[in-house]
Structure formats: C-alpha cells, structure tokens
UniProtKB/Swiss-Prot annotation:
Residues reported in the UniProt entry to bind Zn(2+): H78, H82
Entry protein name: Protein SprT
UniProt entry tagged with the keyword Transcription regulation: no
Species per Swiss-Prot/TrEMBL record: Yersinia enterocolitica serotype O:8 / biotype 1B (strain NCTC 13174 / 8081)
Pfam families named in the record: SprT-like, Zn_ribbon_SprT
UniProt key word Metal-binding: yes
Molecular function in Gene Ontology: zinc ion binding
Subcellular location field: Cytoplasm
Amino acid sequence: MSSLRIPIALQQAVMRCLRHKLQLANQHLGTDYPEPKINYHQRGTSAGSAYLQSFEIRLNPVLLLENQQPFIDEVVPHELAHLLVYRQFGRVPPHGKEWRWMMEHVLQVPASRTHQFAVTSVRSKTFNYQCKCQQHALTIRRHNKVQRGESEYRCRECGEKLQFVAKKTC
C-alpha cells in the first residue's frame, strides 16, 4: 500500500496545534511532558489513535487531507488528551471523566468521543448478511471471522444469527 503524502504546510499545522495544546497542558498540570511522536499511518475509519506506552499519535492521512482544519482542531487534541491522561492518571477508561476533564478544562476543546467526518473514501468493503427482519453489512474482518468459524453475529432487533447472503452469479 502506498502512503499518501501530507503537504508540509499541513504537517506544520498539525505540529503547531500539538505544541500549543501540549504547552497548555504542561502549564496547567505543572509538568514537562515531552512532545509525542506523530505519524500518518492510521487506516480505516478511525481518525487517530494514541499509543500510550510509546507516547505516539497515529493520524489518518486521508481524513486529515479531506477535513484539514476541523481534523486538526478536534483529532489532535483528542489523541493528545489520551496520552496526557495516561501519564497523569495511569490506566483509566479511555473516554472517562479524566479524559473529559483533560479535553475541556486543560486543552480547552469540547470533549467528543467520535468524529463526524465523512468516511466513504476510507470505508472498507462490506458483506451482506441477513436475519429474519433486515439486511446487515459486515466488515471484511467480521466476515472473515464468520467464514473461519471464529465468530457469529446476531441481530440486535430479532436476535437471530446472521446468515451470509452470497452474491448471485449469472
């Protein structure tokens, strides 16, 4: 898979936001946390991930390119907050009260667990499954688990086990 090139100006905007929010946190908390490593290798529909032990933030390059400033304003502080909470409080729920406090009171950003970016360009292929009451689209990962007999999925409405609907060939 070839990686997307993130323009230097966009990388610099990410780093400006990261450094500004980190400075706010260090001043507010009386700490001197180092700058986390940033990479642009996040895949799928996730906008970003925080790697706690390695103090690293992984950002989705496609969603960054498609949503530039809103992405920087929301996702960079969101992932930074995870790292700071881990350093400050240890292992706590990922979007718990400590994380919300870090987002709103320290980083001064509204605490939102999920992004609202369009994901059609990064959504993976889905497979059709059916129950008694409706059709379901399973991701390739879930489909493969069903095919290998490792998992089964049930409808939340009727409780019936989902059955794969094979595509008809002519």
